[in-house]
Amino acid sequence: QGILGDLLLTGNGAPEDKARAVELYGAAAKGGYVPAMCDLGLCYENGDGVEEDLRHAVLWYRKSAEEGYAPGQCNLAVCYLNGNGVERDAAAAVRWLEKAAAQGNARAQSILGDLCRDGEGTEMDAARAFQLYTQAAEQGYPPAQCALGYCYEVGSGTAEDKTKAVEWYARAAEQEHPRAMCNLGLCYEYGEGVAEDKTKAAEWYEKAARRGYAPAQCNLGFFYDRGVGVAEDAAKAVEWYERAAEQGYPRAQCNLGYCYESGKGVKEDKARAVKLYRQAAEQGSSAGQCNL
């Protein structure tokens, strides 16, 4: 029932029927099949085949978690971390993540690494974060590969090693992880751990930008603005600044404001410039505050 539910939920090998998938998961879960309990929780969390119900999601995640199922433990932890269907409790999230991480669950290891890095729900421990990221990264988990790259880049929990940072960013970027793509672009832009190459930097920024990553959209806009790694194109600069600004990215709001103020790549509009500067300024952007 659980396997058939998987096929019906995804439409892989059978016509997609999410409602029927939920029925099958429910039957399997009530029959004691632990993976189906977690799958049913996911359906309730995402509203797949059933009305979204975060409390029911937590209920089924908990049932699978208490049976020792690592994905269920991880999903329950994330609910605690985000306050979805349950009161937010970072310490409870850590307890469940520890259980899943001990079973080698890469996602749990990576999220637990984030909490150790930030000291959320547990003591701040950069060395432990590095260890957890390494365990997850070696299993091919892109968020952990990116985080591990950053540890090597800045020397957090380990000795600084820019070359290793590039290696891990590249592994995550190859799996289309947007932040890793952007970070790899930064390495190429500034020659950190790799030979400086503005063209490659632009290529990586564009890959991340097309996946909606605001910092990369802003960086790509700046490259078009100044003709770095690409032919100068003020209109394209505005286009990319707009995309990042729409996501509330302060640097892009400020840069776009200047385009409107000066009429570069877009029709001059001082009122729009002021609005954008204010949006950036209210988020603490010193450039936005100064321009405003």
Each predicted region: which residue ranges?
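Short helix-capping/linker turns of helical repeat alpha-solenoids
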Residues: 1, 10-12, 17, 30-33, ...
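Glycine- and small/polar-enriched repetitive beta-structure motifs of secreted/surface proteins
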Residues: 6, 82, 94-97, 205, ...
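Short, intrinsically disordered, charge-balanced linker/junction segments flanking boundaries
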Residues: 284-292
